[in-house]
Amino acid sequence: MNWEVVKLRLNMALATLGIVLLGFALALAVADYAFGAQFGVGLMLSILMFIFFLNIIQWLFGPYMINWAYRTVEVTPTDPVYGWLYSTVAEVAKYNGFRDVPKVYIADVPFPNAFAYGSPIAGKRIAFTLPILKLLNRDEIMAVAGHELGHLKHRDVELLMAVGLIPALIYYLGWWIFWGGMFGGGGGNGRGNNGGLLFLIGIAMMAVSFVFQLLVLSINRMREAYADVNSALTVPGGKENLQLALAKLTLSMDPGALEKFKKKSTTNQMASMLFFTNAIEEVPTWNARELVEIWKTTKVPWYAEIFMDHPHPAKRIQLLEKVSKY
């Protein structure tokens, strides 16, 4: 049994459950205080239904919008140029127990990235941008595919969409309380002449929703780490090739990253790297290997990734090292 994986799964489960329970408890208590139990619960349910409906629409039709925004072209097994990419994804899909191969797309955008997406009506999909295909070799592409297919296998989109309802619920509840205070109070224990108090509670709730959004980001970082682990455990050579892929992506976006990490700079937010532009197309493998070795011993302070949706690359490298020991 791989205890690092067990620990990661336990942390994800506890964090997700904690955010949901704490968020609902806070919203229910504040709604009761501001509007009374009956109206407060009704308002909460109405808000939840509203944001749930919007999220469902976005989830169902989002893949089509992504294809349009990223100018994607589907790759078929017989494609004379990129047929190898389809066969690569098919091989990784087999390793991960997929019954059908997800649809494979190439995105015509100027930065290196890969992403998995899909919905019940659009099916499972995985896309690679043209720059990442030039930057990485086939083994590294396989490792990246193992990461992305891990998101599909673990249903990360659906889970994060569900958890993301909590900060939205708290924000819109705060918005209602804010305007209730502006017009003289609600209908619960805080009504009457406490419009000013409700006004402040509304502002506080909207601020608290931002804190919950940071907690959701922490869940996202865990899911990204879990996808890394999936690649390491299901793809032959996945650990080493995913490490090299991450280093090459970092160096392509910031050719000076190696020197920065040599100076032990741990505040550079690399997780946003996948959304930069003007990447270089070739990165020497020995530079990537050197950066991986530096990351293995880099100490990352807790606050370095608080606003990031991906773990710090050094943490990703170190987790992959721990997982591979079992």
UniProtKB/Swiss-Prot annotation:
Its EC number is 3.4.24.-. Keywords: Cell membrane, Hydrolase, Membrane, Metal-binding, Metalloprotease, Protease, Transmembrane, Transmembrane helix, Zinc. It is an enzyme of class 3 (hydrolase). Coiled coil: none annotated. It is a multi-pass membrane protein. The chain crosses the membrane at residues 10-30, 41-61, 159-179, 197-217. Its main location: membrane. The active site is at residue 148. One of its GO terms (cellular component) is plasma membrane. Binds 1 zinc ion per subunit. Pfam families: Peptidase_M48. One of its GO terms (molecular function) is zinc ion binding. Its cofactor is Zn(2+). It is found in: Cell membrane. It comes from the Archaea. Zn(2+) binds at residues 147, 151, 224. InterPro entries: HtpX_protease, Pept_M48_protease_HtpX, Peptidase_M48. Belongs to the peptidase M48B family. This is Protease HtpX homolog. It comes from Saccharolobus islandicus (strain Y.N.15.51 / Yellowstone #2). The lineage of its organism: Archaea, Thermoproteota, Thermoprotei, Sulfolobales, Sulfolobaceae. The gene is htpX.
